[in-house]
Curated annotation (Swiss-Prot):
It comes from the Bacteria. The keyword Hydrolase applies. This is Endonuclease MutS2. Belongs to the DNA mismatch repair MutS family. MutS2 subfamily.
């Protein structure tokens, strides 16, 4: 694609519209290099990627990426055997963390079929060992002491020496404070010094490092700490050497994987760009257009992307048309319509969504040429006409049948009669070569050309003669007219003068009357089309509302069914409990054999129905109505499915219940009574039966990887509550390493929870700092 069309249509400004939605430097770089292409398979691939990302957003509306830096230069440095510094390793650390998050997200992705993006997700390479090694590089920009034994030993020595220096200096401050200009320890040339009054400089022996501007204060390093400071300086040098050795070791570890990590970064940036395109679509109403097999263009409600509140227009440039000629006066929006077509094509061929409605269709052109605006060259001393004609000559030499040509004010800048003749000749040459062309002109002669010539259609921009303002609405099939007589009369010119002017142009008046009738017919057709679209929109709204009601009905139905199942299970549990009590009594008071007891128990279990319709059980309904809860009753909390005991009734009618390790305040409708009062139970014979052991324990692990922060905190809160209700002693929380946001949120939550006895990271072989083990009180 020639670069001149990109400058003419301000394609760089189009790309700037997508920049705010990008999160990664790699995505910004890819956007900056984005250019239109004539390769259909490339455009199709970009369109499918956007469709895939739209599906992801349906299931995960808040899908996002963490910010990453461009690592192209540093991966090349690795390949060239150079060593990386701490900041560069932090950039690698972030890329590996985002890679892990994306991989986990993709593995957990459900109900989404991806046609193109699946290949990108699959190609992400995860390096757990490399990520583990980078734990030694702290996000604050320093190497952790545990990176090596030598570094840990050196830093301990520095700490010890610094403590000794601090103690000695504090002692001097305490004992010789009157000799000091200030009761603080200062620093000069990297050494700890004391601000000594000049009159006492000989009373404190040591090394003078500085003197104040006034000369009243001398900064002295006491001799008692000189040797210690020398040791600290030496240890600092050892520390720097050891850090450099660690960085070299890490560089050697990463070097074999530089290409794969660079590819990860590219995939992250590309996914970021695709995500930005879809976010742009969500914010602006842009769409992914259909792609025509031939040069068949249909743009529905298309808008100019760089004009705020631009008027939407329909444009049909199908296979039955080679040229569209937009006629009419200036300032009506002809040039904007010309640019809108060009931008829609360039954006689509760059793999970007276009500002139009669904059902829009674009073609694929090998080149797009344009002569738009006044490109007069002062240096070449060319007139407006010469400038345009030079450009048009160049276009005619380069175009072929796969090109799209946009010509603004064709033939302008010279004698009107000659200019019109040239314009018709140029258009005819392009038509015979079957080159798609849209041209604007104010010459009336081209109206007749549009009417009389095959494969050519007239068009114009609507003008409101009442307000004397253009409406910027595109009227395809209707040639433009000047409206000069109507405008002059409305502005106050006498009817006599206007009438005399009309007599001078009888033929033109007839043509204008025909055009006026065509305009009226077009407006009527447009009104009908608008009405049809309004009905379609109402139908869509109705269908969406109906679908919403249907889904709500199904959810409520499922909720009621679940509630009924819980109540039914309560009855079943009660029956089984009573049956075990009966069998226990029988076992104590009879000589039944064990296998006979088991058979009897199995038969009793069969008495429990698979489902119980409580709504039709009048006896149970009456029994529940007659019996009120009281302190000491066993209950089932319906929202949690957990058993508890009523402790006391509050003044407002609510109940306080002990459920596991926590106390809860419940409304009466939030729990069900489990057992009848003992005095209401009939006396039964006792049989001893061995109870079944429940081997299915509650879930003791929570995986928060790939979750949003708010979603993760909600799941964590519910999980801890459930663990406490089940009297669990210990649970594991997997949060991953990533950006550290979720890990920090988990830590803050656990610190605030009064039921947590202790918590800490898992052993290295069980997840390390990517998992937290929680022990309850």
């Amino acid at each position: 694609m020639n670069t001149k069309i990109l400058e003419t249509l301000e394609f760089s400004k189009i790309k700037e519209l997508f920049a705010p939605y990008l999160l990664t430097e790699q995505g910004q770089l890819e956007l900056g290099l984005l250019l239109p292409t004539s390769k259909k398979e490339t455009v199709v691939s970009a369109f499918l990627e956007m469709t895939d990302m739209q599906q992801i957003f349906v299931q995960h509306p808040h899908f996002s990426l963490a910010a990453t830096q461009d690592i192209t230069a540093l991966t090349k440095r690795l390949e060239l055997e150079s060593d990386l510094n701490i900041e560069e390793f932090l950039a690698l650390k972030r890329v590996l963390a985002v890679t892990q998050e994306l991989k986990s997200f993709y593995e957990d992705l459900e109900n989404v079929h991806l046609e193109k993006l699946d290949r990108l997700f699959d190609n992400l390479a995860v390096f757990p060992k490399l990520q583990g090694s980078l734990q030694a590089v702290n996000d604050g920009g320093f190497i952790e002491s545990f990176a090596s034994e030598s570094l840990s030993r050196i830093r301990r020595k520095i700490q010890e020496n610094e403590n000794q220096v601090r103690e000695i200096l504090q002692e001097i401050l305490k004992n010789k404070g009157e000799m000091l200009a200030d009761q603080v320890v200062a620093s000069r040339n990297g050494r700890n010094v004391l601000p000594v009054k000049n009159t006492y400089r000989n009373r404190i022996s040591g090394v003078v490092h500085d003197i104040s501007a006034s000369g009243n204060t001398v900064y002295i390093e006491p001799r008692a700490v000189v040797n210690l400071n020398e040791e600290i300086a030496s240890s600092r040098a050892d520390e720097r050497y050891e850090i450099q050795r660690i960085l070299q070791e890490l560089s050697d570890l990463f070097r074999p994987h530089a290409a794969e990590i660079a590819n990860n970064a590219w995939i992250i940036g590309h996914l970021d760009l695709v995500r930005a395109k879809v976010r742009f679509m969500q914010e602006t109403g842009a769409v992914v257009p259909d792609l025509s097999e031939e040069q068949d263009i249909q743009l529905l409600s298309v808008r100019h992307p760089l004009i705020e509140n631009a008027v939407a227009n329909d444009l049909h440039f199908g296979l039955d048309l080679t040229e569209i000629v937009i006629t009419g006066p200036n300032t009506g929006g002809k040039t904007i319509m010309l640019k809108t077509l060009g931008l829609a094509q360039i954006m689509a061929q760059s793999g970007l969504p276009i500002l139009a409605d669904k059902g829009s269709r674009v073609g694929i052109f090998s080149q797009i040429f344009a002569d738009i605006g006044d490109e007069q060259s002062i240096e070449q001393s060319l007139s407006t006409f010469s400038s345009h004609m030079t450009n048009i000559v160049s276009i005619l030499e380069q175009v072929d049948s796969e090109s799209l040509v946009l010509l603004d004010e064709l033939g302008a800048g010279t004698d009107p009669q000659e200019g019109a003749a040239l314009a018709i000749a140029i258009l005819e040459d392009l038509r015979l070569r079957q080159i798609k062309t849209m041209a604007t002109t104010h010459y009336p002669e081209l109206k007749a050309y549009g009417i009389e010539t095959d494969w050519v259609e007239n068009a114009s921009m609507e003008f409101d003669t009442d307000s004397l303002r253009p409406t910027y609405r595109f009227m395809q099939g209707v040639p433009g007219r000047s409206n000069a007589f109507e405008i002059a009369q409305r502005l106050g010119l006498s009817e006599v003068i206007v009438g005399h002017a009309q007599e001078q142009t009888d033929t033109d008046s007839d043509v204008n009357r025909i055009i006026e009738r065509l305009e009226e017919q077009t407006l009527e057709s447009r009104k009908r089309l608008d009405n049809i679209r309004e009905v379609e929109q109402e139908n869509l709204k109705f269908n969406r509302a109906l679908k919403k009601l249907y889904n709500e009905f199904n959810r409520e139905k499922e909720t009621e069914l679940n509630k009924a199942r819980l109540e039914a299970q309560e009855i079943v549990d009660l029956a089984l409990s009573e049956s075990e009590s009966i069998l226990k009594n029988l076992h104590d008071k009879s000589s039944l054999k064990p296998h006979e007891i088991i058979e009897a128990k199995a038969q009793l279990k069969k008495l429990a129905p698979e489902t119980v319709d409580l709504s039709k059980n009048k006896v149970l309904k009456q029994a529940k109505k007659n019996r009120a809860p009281k302190v000491g009753d066993d209950i089932l909390v319906t929202s949690y499915g957990q058993r508890g005991t009523l402790v006391k009734q509050l003044k407002d009618g609510r109940w306080e219940a002990q459920v596991g390790l926590i106390k809860m305040t419940l409304e009466e409708q939030e729990f069900n009574l489990l057992k009848a009062e003992k005095e209401q139970q009939p006396k039964r014979k006792q049989v001893n039966v061995v109870k079944r052991a429940n081997t299915a324990g509650p879930k003791a692990r929570l995986d928060l990887r790939g979750k949003r922060y708010e979603e993760a905190m909600e799941e964590l809160d519910a999980f801890i509550d459930q663990a406490l209700l089940n009297n669990m002693a210990q649970v594991d929380i997997i949060h991953g390493i990533g950006t550290g946001v979720i890990r920090e949120g988990v830590t803050k939550y656990l610190r605030r929870n009064k039921h947590v006895k202790s918590f800490g990271y898992a052993p290295q072989n069980a997840g390390g700092s990517g998992a937290t083990i929680v022990i309850f009180k």
